Amino acid sequence: MRFAIVVTGPAYGTQQASSAFQFAQALIAEGHKLSSVFFYREGVYNANQLTSPASDEFDLVRGWQQLNAQHGVALNICVAAALRRGVVDETEAGRLGLASSNLQQGFTLSGLGALAEASLTCDRVVQF
């Protein structure tokens, strides 16, 4: 089965993103195809490369990045939600006159079209 995941919670502070990550790993372990993860609302904080968890905590941002690198899972970030929350790539930082960007490598700023496409091409869309 082909799956897509929607994450609406931040990397830390709620269980949503952590549960989504564990679900993603379980899907892959069971032989399912995880096509994409779409980060929306507070979920865009999962793509902030400046996140620095305590040394005894799992680094969820880098975990998502590894999921992308090892399994080719697309990590799409809602551009409107990201800009409102200060998560920007180099292009947007330049366009907005910001000093730097903070979008973690492996994540892509995208519109809601990426979510619509995932919902049309996948068998299941699961939201956390």
From Swiss-Prot:
One example GO MF annotation: sulfurtransferase activity
EC number per UniProt: 2.8.1.-
One Pfam family this sequence matches: DsrE
Coiled coil: none
List of catalytic residues: C78
UniProt GO cellular component terms: sulfurtransferase complex
Enzyme class: transferase
Keyword terms: Cytoplasm, Transferase, tRNA processing
InterPro entries the record matches: DsrEFH-like, Sulphur_relay_DsrE/F-like, Sulphur_relay_TusD/DsrE
A Gene Ontology biological process term: tRNA wobble position uridine thiolation
Protein location: Cytoplasm
Subunit structure: Heterohexamer, formed by a dimer of trimers. The hexameric TusBCD complex contains 2 copies each of TusB, TusC and TusD. The TusBCD complex interacts with TusE.
Function text: Part of a sulfur-relay system required for 2-thiolation of 5-methylaminomethyl-2-thiouridine (mnm(5)s(2)U) at tRNA wobble positions. Accepts sulfur from TusA and transfers it in turn to TusE.
Sequence similarity: Belongs to the DsrE/TusD family.
Matches recorded under HAMAP family: Thiourid_synth_D (MF_00390)
Name of the molecule in the record: Sulfurtransferase TusD
Organism of provenance: Shigella dysenteriae serotype 1 (strain Sd197)
